[in-house]
Amino acid sequence: MSGPFERSELLAEVKRAQEGPPLLLTGPPGAGKTTLLHAAVDALAREGWHHVYLDLLAAATSPERFVQSALAALPDGLEGRAAARAREADHLSRGGRREGARAVQALLSTWAALDTVEGRPIALVLDEATEIRSLAYFSGLREVDAPFGAALAARPRGTLLATSFPGVARKLWPHLATLAMPPLSAAELQGEARTRGLRVDGSALAAASFGWPRYARILLDRLEQGMALATAWADEMALGGRLEQACRHTYEVLLLRSRGYGMSKAVLAAVAAEEGLNLTALVVRLGRTPGAIRDYLGWLLAVDALRTTRKRYYYVDGVLRLWVRLHARGVRASEEEILACARELLATAAPLPAAEAVAAASRHQGLMEID
């Protein structure tokens, strides 16, 4: 599987996990983590690897259902310890909720023992790995993240993970190697635009999307329809637009993973109105004690809704920040307000240096990319 943005350097970095310890990809929703995981799977398959892929966001429901989903992803022909533990996990998972914890433990032992099948090495690829904590509410699995981490650490090669919550992952598995997904550069976006036959400045597209592939893809689709960038951004950020819906989903997910739902919305609104505020300034704006605001900020930092630099607070996802300013205030944003926001955003874009633009174009000439 390949996406519309060729990220060969990142793919090469990820592929190093085929002969090393587990590697965790991190980044906000829409950063391209899943696309890169699938690109790695395809690259490994061309080299003779078999893969076991599981999306824990969908699979980590009840213990027995989780185990059955994971077992269904295993290849036929397993032998030795891996096969024995897989049979045990299957038997226990069919015993109902009383055996759920033991079934999960048997599955984790299966993963730890996966090595080869029919002479082909096995890659274990787990998307949204921190979702394993969804099982912690079931009997016997309160600390399920510990044996999960131990099972992964026992694998000498071919283990790839991804998460939208790097703060949670660092707390659970501090020794896990990580690779943060960087935003797309203006040059990369310029190159992709040229492959689509578009004349658009990469810096403007980078400003409009903050470099995140999900947003950039939406905007490029509209540009292909002949729409100007500011108009495309405003149209897709209007209620029901794809930018608006993507941000709304991310906003709700982050709040549900955080704590203090109502007041956390107020904190996000304050930071959206003015980034770079410190604790003292936020206390004044929100009318709560420093201790209370510090707690809310800590919870939002923990789910990577916000980041901090020199004790000042910023959004991880700049497009989400603008969505909060426009749509999280209780009244409907007008078309004029949304378009003005788009124009203000694009006014901050620095032109892409000519040499960089030419280099980007040459890298993409003759390439056809599909999603």
Language-model region placement:
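N-terminal pre-P-loop "Q-motif" helix
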Residues: 2-14
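A short hydrophobic beta-strand->loop->alpha-helix junction that borders the nucleotide-binding pocket
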Residues: 52-61
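Conserved small helical "lid"/interfacial subdomain of P-loop NTPases
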Residues: 180-202, 219
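Conserved NTP-binding/hydrolysis module of P-loop NTPases
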Residues: 61-90
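Amphipathic alpha-helical "lid/sensor" segments that cap RecA-like P-loop NTPase cores
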Residues: 198-249, 266, 310
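C-terminal leucine-rich, beta-strand-based interaction scaffolds used for sensing/assembly
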Residues: 249-371
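Conserved Walker B catalytic segment
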Residues: 101-166, 174
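Walker A/P-loop nucleotide-binding motif
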Residues: 21-38
